[in-house]
Amino acid sequence: MEKETKEKIEKTVIEILSESDMKEITEFKVRKLASEKLAIDLSEKSHKAFVRSVVEKFLDEERAREYENSQVNKEEEDGDKDCGKGNKEFDDDGDLIICRLSDKRRVTIQEFKGKSLVSIREYYKKDGKELPTSKGISLTDEQWSTFKKNMPAIENAVKKMESRV
């Protein structure tokens, strides 16, 4: 499939999805409407796969937007929590502290072997210094993006788990 054709299909599919009721529209309906608008048969296997990828990308972006909006609303409701403060705070190693989750846990951005990592870790005090423990996780940019993209699914799973208890 030519680049120009792909761009036309992608633009049309996104336009259709943007104007549609997401509770009613299906991938088949999107493909059918795009076929009619573009006068191209999109029932071919490669076209179906491409339309599916555009739909999935659109839905992922929508979920991410909804999640971000819900987080912004939560932050506004929560008021003065440590996360999201305008003041930048750094630890003893010079790592940026994004958020203190509790007295012993925090989220930081740190450099390790030339890579930036998002670190969610537990800390302990020794000789007046706060030092990281091995309890925690450090994520690369790519891993963080994947984690963030899947946050709505993780939240839903946690809600289901909590409702069973």
Curated annotation (Swiss-Prot):
<protein>
    <recommendedName>
        <fullName>RNA polymerase II transcriptional coactivator KELP</fullName>
    </recommendedName>
</protein>
<keyword id="KW-0805">Transcription regulation</keyword>
<feature type="region of interest" description="Disordered">
    <location>
        <begin position="66"/>
        <end position="93"/>
    </location>
</feature>
<dbReference type="GO" id="GO:0003713">
    <property type="term" value="F:transcription coactivator activity"/>
</dbReference>
<dbReference type="InterPro" id="IPR003173">
    <property type="entry name" value="PC4_C"/>
</dbReference>
<dbReference type="Pfam" id="PF02229">
    <property type="entry name" value="PC4"/>
</dbReference>
<comment type="function">
    <text>General coactivator that functions cooperatively with TAFs and mediates functional interactions between upstream activators and the general transcriptional machinery. Binds single-stranded DNA.</text>
</comment>
<keyword id="KW-0539">Nucleus</keyword>
<dbReference type="GO" id="GO:0003677">
    <property type="term" value="F:DNA binding"/>
</dbReference>
<dbReference type="InterPro" id="IPR009044">
    <property type="entry name" value="ssDNA-bd_transcriptional_reg"/>
</dbReference>
<keyword id="KW-0010">Activator</keyword>
<keyword id="KW-0238">DNA-binding</keyword>
<dbReference type="InterPro" id="IPR017415">
    <property type="entry name" value="KELP"/>
</dbReference>
<dbReference type="GO" id="GO:0060261">
    <property type="term" value="P:positive regulation of transcription initiation by RNA polymerase II"/>
</dbReference>
<dbReference type="InterPro" id="IPR014876">
    <property type="entry name" value="DEK_C"/>
</dbReference>
<feature type="domain" description="DEK-C">
    <location>
        <begin position="3"/>
        <end position="60"/>
    </location>
</feature>
<keyword id="KW-0804">Transcription</keyword>
<dbReference type="Pfam" id="PF08766">
    <property type="entry name" value="DEK_C"/>
</dbReference>
<dbReference type="GO" id="GO:0005634">
    <property type="term" value="C:nucleus"/>
</dbReference>
<dbReference type="InterPro" id="IPR045125">
    <property type="entry name" value="Sub1/Tcp4-like"/>
</dbReference>
<comment type="similarity">
    <text>Belongs to the transcriptional coactivator PC4 family.</text>
</comment>
